[in-house]
């Protein structure tokens, strides 16, 4: 137990994270004092490590140089000897491993993966084949829906927008079975989920998987950008087609010499032929396309089904049963056995059934639609032309990914009329889908939390009870055009069009999920937990004046009153919205990391921006409210380069640029690690992001000092937050102090620092300070502090202070930066029993995160970034949660409600008492069911 008599200044103990003796203090378990004060190491977990998602899959890597518990057990050591060995090894070898990891050398001696592609024996007859709408973005309109082309032995996906992994996890669609991914355009709307998907596939199994990725020539730009954080092996099968854009050969390119109007054959086997037809906007003067403008029409043609062989006809033509029957069925003519004639296959075979043809059309603008009418290679598929046209093919289904503004235009309708009998499925953004949450599991959790505590979990507009009775009838938009266009329906999530067997050819609605509404969720909740309504009333009383006195007098607050910075604080001062609270990769219940700092009329800041952040904003604020939230973004801060913290950034910035187009505005300021700039610079060749970049190293305490003096920063060792990790001569300094690093010369960053200072002042903030943490190279935490304000009496009172850890092991820099914080948001990836895994992956356990807050004297600590092994709620020792709360997606913490926060935690215990721990992937399941059952029905240790 830490006592107030112990000194807080770690420099008194000669602490340095680059000394093995110092790392012994923080790595197992975390303690701010010498080993004599540290508690004994917790027992190792019996559970196998879970997939790390974006960064690693499968078992944890072997601990280099130190002995694992399993090795010690095999060596037959006694418990006492084992404890001594662990303590000794950890003080030296753990340091060596973490030092190598901080230097980025932990993978040098790790053999590189040669990712394999799926190879399967194809089945030409395909007893089952269909196309299916994967409704990503159909409720939030933040991304393009995907389309799955399914065969017995092959899978093809068209478009990989943000949220695709999360969607497939919930609906049990195995992405590991996917062979090819096709992009109809190369932009954040259609490819926002591709980086995370490639990383996840690369981590499957011992060898990892790689898929073929196809797209127009713009794909080269995306590949160049992704190289900054995705292994090259994961992208070796990316292929672009179409005219070259005169850039580096990042991806192999096919069809360079073909006329642009010709179709490019991408896949042609016994199962399917997939061709691509380029579609560019019409131009009066300019020639050539700009990056991001090229769209693609994909044509999927299945082989014909040969007619049935008729043995009676064969016998009548003088053929005896034998090998000649097989020759005829294979298409060869044979001589009759008893007649002087030649028997042709058509004489004995029934009529063949033409193979189905499916078109996927992405026509993003009316300018593209004008060109659509004049594409020569499309004439083969028009049924309105003369039936005598050679090679005419009947199109069975057309999936329109085009927006409603285009499909409703007269130009587009005239093109659609050329396919008389085709089934049209309109999969663009349709308003009716707002009433049908696509991510049902997380929507159900959010609705339950909203019922329990609407103060911390407000519901968006389309989840409110008022909208339940006014929703649009799902069949009201089914018929979209006149009868001359054939049958046209609006796409719904998981809608299928069956291609095989031929007898079932057509639309199949059997997989469409039933409608989920807030009222339905409430009925389920009240039936499951009848006393939840009384708990809701108890929570309401926490905001009453009669209960405030009780809360202030709670002995565990550590203060006689709430902090002075919260005195008479207004509700429009600041609100923390936790958009994503999971780690590694998206799951059914938690998205990856993103925190929206709402300063209301003064603007907003985003701390980290994992994949799907824009969609989460729309689920929190509604469609119009989310657009306003994006418009108000002034600054985006990224902690480190791991994909679960930044792959939603391009989509957010692109949407902001789109919303502010034509309006007077300033570019968004993006603060992040230097490696992020490499990604953004490369990506902006594809899509303008309207941003300015500032390295986190330029926003440390010493860098801000250079703004005050208007002189370049001189690197000196000091006692500030970054001093111990980057002290003169340290190994960490050698990592970052390179000729191109802003640490060497801060002069180029001064204009951007001054601009950031101006923006912070306009938002009522005194500072934004980044500080290094122990996770990976160029990993940072951040501190935000509000400016002083006057109370009712006119007295100056300090502004609040908020600190966010990013991903980190507990470290003195984290404690130092958190001193006096009003609220600390700290990662707590692992439960306390998994400290070994936390050390190996440079993350924190829940107890360690809480210790950081208590050691720094933080008023409130919010735990986040939970491992996805905990589907709904993490394993928590409730006795440590005196001034702490756990975070959920969509949780909104207003500074005016901060004093109530810890009192809510026990009510979560009631809400989730009947929930069980779910392992979301079959590969993760263990035989030790008792281990899982030990953690239910309660997720707390009383």
Curated annotation (Swiss-Prot):
Coiled coil location: none
Compositionally biased spans, kind Basic and acidic residues: 67-85
Top-level class of the enzyme under EC nomenclature: hydrolase
Region (Disordered): 38-85
The organism's place on the tree of life at top rank: Eukaryota
Stored SUPFAM superfamilies: Metallo-hydrolase/oxidoreductase
Transit peptide as recorded in UniProt: 1-50
Molecular function terms from GO: 3'-tRNA processing endoribonuclease activity; metal ion binding
Subcellular location: Mitochondrion
Predominant localisation class: mitochondrion
GO biological process, one term: tRNA 3'-end processing
General function of this protein: Zinc phosphodiesterase, which displays tRNA 3'-processing endonuclease activity. Involved in tRNA maturation, by removing a 3'-trailer from precursor tRNA. Can process the mitochondrial tRNA-like structures (t-elements).
Protein name: tRNAse Z TRZ4, mitochondrial
Gene: TRZ4
């Amino acid at each position: 137990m830490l006592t107030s008599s112990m000194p807080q200044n770690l420099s008194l103990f000669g602490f340095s994270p680059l000394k093995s003796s110092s790392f012994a203090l923080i790595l197992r378990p975390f303690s701010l004092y010498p080993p004599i004060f540290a508690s004994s190491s917790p027992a190792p977990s019996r559970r196998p490590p879970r997939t790390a998602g974006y960064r690693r899959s499968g078992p944890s890597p072997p601990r280099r140089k130190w002995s694992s518990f399993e090795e010690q057990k095999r060596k037959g050591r006694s418990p006492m000897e084992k404890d001594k060995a662990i303590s000794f090894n950890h003080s030296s070898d753990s340091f060596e491993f973490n030092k190598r990891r901080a230097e980025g050398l932990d993978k040098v001696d790790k053999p590189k993966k040669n990712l394999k592609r799926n190879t399967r024996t194809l089945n030409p007859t395909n007893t089952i084949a269909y196309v299916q709408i994967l409704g990503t973005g159909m409720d939030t309109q933040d991304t393009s829906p995907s389309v799955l082309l399914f065969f017995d032995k092959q899978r093809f996906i068209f478009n990989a927008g943000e949220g695709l992994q999360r969607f497939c996890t919930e609906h049990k669609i195995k992405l590991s079975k996917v062979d090819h991914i096709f992009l109809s355009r190369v932009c954040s709307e259609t490819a926002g989920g591709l980086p995370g998907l490639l990383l996840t596939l690369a981590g499957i199994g011992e060898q990892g998987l790689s898929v073929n990725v196809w797209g127009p020539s713009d794909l080269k730009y995306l590949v160049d950008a992704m190289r900054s954080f995705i292994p090259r092996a994961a992208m070796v099968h990316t292929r672009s087609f179409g005219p070259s854009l005169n850039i580096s050969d990042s991806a192999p390119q096919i069809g360079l010499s073909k006329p642009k109007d010709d179709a490019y054959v991408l896949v042609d086997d016994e199962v399917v032929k997939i061709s691509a037809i380029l579609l560019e906007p019409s131009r009066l003067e300019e020639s050539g396309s700009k990056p991001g403008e090229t769209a693609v029409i994909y044509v999927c043609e299945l082989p014909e089904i040969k007619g049935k062989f008729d043995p009676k006809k064969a016998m009548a033509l003088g053929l005896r049963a034998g090998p000649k029957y097989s020759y005829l069925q294979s298409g060869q003519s044979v001589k009759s056995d008893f007649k002087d004639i030649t028997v042709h296959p058509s004489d004995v075979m029934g009529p063949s059934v033409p193979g189905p043809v499916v078109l996927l059309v992405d026509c993003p603008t009316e300018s593209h639609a004008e060109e659509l009418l004049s594409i020569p290679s499309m004439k083969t598929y028009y049924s309105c032309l003369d039936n005598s046209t050679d090679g005419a093919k009947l199109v069975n289904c057309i999936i329109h990914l085009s927006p409603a503004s285009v499909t409703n235009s007269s130009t587009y309708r005239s093109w659609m009329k050329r396919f008389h009998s085709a089934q049209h499925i309109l999969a663009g953004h349709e308003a009716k889908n707002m009433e049908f949450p696509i991510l049902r599991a997380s929507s159900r959790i959010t609705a339950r939390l909203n019922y329990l505590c609407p103060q911390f979990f407000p519901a968006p507009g389309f989840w409110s009870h008022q909208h339940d009775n006014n929703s649009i009838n799902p069949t009201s938009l089914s018929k979209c055009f006149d009868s001359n266009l054939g049958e046209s329906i609006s796409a719904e999530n998981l809608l299928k069009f069956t291609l095989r067997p031929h007898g079932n050819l057509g639309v199949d609605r059997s997989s469409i999920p039933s409608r989920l509404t807030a009222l339905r969720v409430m009925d389920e909740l009240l039936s499951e937990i009848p006393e939840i309504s009384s708990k809701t009333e108890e929570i309401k009383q926490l905001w009453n004046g009669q209960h405030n006195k009780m809360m202030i007098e709670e002995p565990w607050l550590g203060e006689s009153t709430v902090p002075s910075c919260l005195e008479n604080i207004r509700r429009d001062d600041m609100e923390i919205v936790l958009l994503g609270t999971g780690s590694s990769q998206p799951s059914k219940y938690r998205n990856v990391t993103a925190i929206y700092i709402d300063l209301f009329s003064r603007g907003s800041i985003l701390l980290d921006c994992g994949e799907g952040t824009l969609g989460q904003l729309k689920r929190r604020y509604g469609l119009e409210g989310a657009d306003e939230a994006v418009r108000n973004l002034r600054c985006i801060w990224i902690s480190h380069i791991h994909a679960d913290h930044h792959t939603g950034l391009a989509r957010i910035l692109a949407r902001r640029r789109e919303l502010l187009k034509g309006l007077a505005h300033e570019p968004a300021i993006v603060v992040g690690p230097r490696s992020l700039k490499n990604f953004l610079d490369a990506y902006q060749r594809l899509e303008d992001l309207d941003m300015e970049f500032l390295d986190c190293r330029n926003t440390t305490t010493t860098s801000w000092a250079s703004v005050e003096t208007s002189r370049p920063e001189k690197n000196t060792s000091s006692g500030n937050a970054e001093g111990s990790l980057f002290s003169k001569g340290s190994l960490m300094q050698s990592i970052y102090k390179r000729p191109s690093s802003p640490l060497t010369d801060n002069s180029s960053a001064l204009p951007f620092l001054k601009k950031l200072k101006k923006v912070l002042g306009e938002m009522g903030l005194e500072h934004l300070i980044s500080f290094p943490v122990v996770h990976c190279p160029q990993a940072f935490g951040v501190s935000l502090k509000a400016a002083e304000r006057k109370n009712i009496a006119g007295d100056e009172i300090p502004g609040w202070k908020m600190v966010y850890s990013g991903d980190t092991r507990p470290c003195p820099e984290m404690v130092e930066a958190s001193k006096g914080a009003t609220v600390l948001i700290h990662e707590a990836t692992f439960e306390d029993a998994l400290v070994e895994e936390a050390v190996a992956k440079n993350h924190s356990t829940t107890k360690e995160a809480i210790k950081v807050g208590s050691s720094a004297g933080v008023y409130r600590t919010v735990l986040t970034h939970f491992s996805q092994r905990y589907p709904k709620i993490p394993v928590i020792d409730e006795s440590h949660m005196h001034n702490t709360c756990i975070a959920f997606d969509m949780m909104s913490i207003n500074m005016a409600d901060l004093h109530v926060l810890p009192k809510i935690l026990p009510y979560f215990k009631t809400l989730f008492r009947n929930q069980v721990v779910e392992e979301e992937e079959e590969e993760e399941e263990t035989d030790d069911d008792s281990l899982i059952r030990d953690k239910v029905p309660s997720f707390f240790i009383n």
